[in-house]
Amino acid sequence: MALDKDIVGSIEFLEVVGLQGSTYLLKGPNGENVKLNQSEMNDDDELEVGEEYSFFIYPNRSGELFATQNMPDITKDKYDFAKVLKTDRDGARIDVGLPREVLVPWEDLPKVKSLWPQPGDYLLVTLRIDRENHMYGRLASESVVENMFTPVHDDNLKNEVIEAKPYRVLRIGSFLLSESGYKIFVHESERKAEPRLGESVQVRIIGHNDKGELNGSFLPLAHERLDDDGQVIFDLLVEYDGELPFWDKSSPEAIKEVFNMSKGSFKRAIGHLYKQKIINIETGKIALTKKGWSRMDSKE
């Protein structure tokens, strides 16, 4: 018998009709048969036969309906960020707070595979239930984000650097949403590389439009851009996990061998990096600061 999918992927009141071993038997509003494992109950809740309780209903991999009192972060009516657990040829598998992972199909991901999310990234999704009662993650569309973002109508955020995640990636630019709900567009001319879908990145705000959407940049301010020597040092710091055993008292020979520059050029370069708060200079070493790492995170 085909299962009624109206309740699947949503929070509903179900009646407890029995107990088999460690599994409660529940009845949906349309007569659906739903199972509840005791491991999915609230610790302080005791269920009584004949009473109704609130549950989230989801299908297992074979389409059989199960319930949980551990409410997920998203439902088929609610969008939120969900953590990517892994990717494979079928797509990205995400954690939505249920006993099982949920698949975002490969067809919904960027055509360029290097822009696919990686484990630890976060996708803005809701739940989708197909005709066979299988559950998938659905990426937020532009129209969805239009109805959920927090508009900004002043310049208070201009030149501020905030963290955001791309929910849509196109050649023309990157569309991002921050934890505070700010909607940000970064034109292709304001980036050196394209961020992954769902990647946490640092974006500098450069303006806003009449709709309250922010415009951003992954490029540093002109006066913060590195000269050739500074870029060499910065790139080596990134390559060696943020620290190098060199400072202004290192020998000219060692500096020349590693950086291919004179000691005078090296001292000027680390001085500029220090003034821009990109590095700290300590006894015997230089190290990237949090701001320095953020340049890497924002694709400098």
Swiss-Prot record:
By its UniProt entry, which Gene3D superfamilies does this protein fall under? Nucleic acid-binding proteins, Winged helix-like DNA-binding domain superfamily/Winged helix DNA-binding domain
Keyword DNA-binding belongs to the record: no
Q: Which family does it belong to?
A: Belongs to the CvfB family.
Key word Phosphoprotein present: no
| Keywords, ordered alphabetically | Virulence
Protein name, entry field = Conserved virulence factor B
Q: Which gene encodes it?
A: cvfB
Function noted in UniProt = Contributes to the expression of virulence factors and to pathogenicity via both agr-dependent and agr-independent pathways. Involved in the production of hemolysin, DNase, protease and protein A. Contributes to virulence in silkworm-infection model and murine model of systemic infection.
